[in-house]
């Protein structure tokens, strides 16, 4: 049975970011894959819900004026790494006209597609968070700390949600920028936990 008191929030664990040779490879990202797998395994086991963001770009997206082309729809690089995927996955496009089924939360993993850095630009993100309720705690991990991780965590905090960053399951492009982002999140109320602590939190809440 899923624990709805805690939700894991995985940020952009995609081939182009996570794997050497990816179009926008984050140096060192492959080192956090084992911890991502450990966290996602809990969703595979039906222990809790996993929400993921995923870049799904078109070839001419405006973001490519700032960053090299990456995660283009239909290319291998847009795929979430196998270690970041559960078995029952439901993808939600960045399209406000798309209707979500009542059974959306019956899945192990919900993937929110985006074409910008901020997952809350997908209009369905707000609705998913609202439907999960204000008492849900979010454990955030993935890449990149100073961009998409920061915006996802801050977006949740701004909406009154409790957020913890899984500190050994994140990676940054530039260390100084990543540290600045984490300091800001800490000042806003984010906590920091290890993968071991995150897994123990789920087990502890489930036992209550």
Question: Which sequence ranges carry the predicted segments?
Answer:
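A short glycine-rich beta-strand->turn/loop micro-motif centered on a GG-aromatic cluster
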Residues: 139-142, 161-175
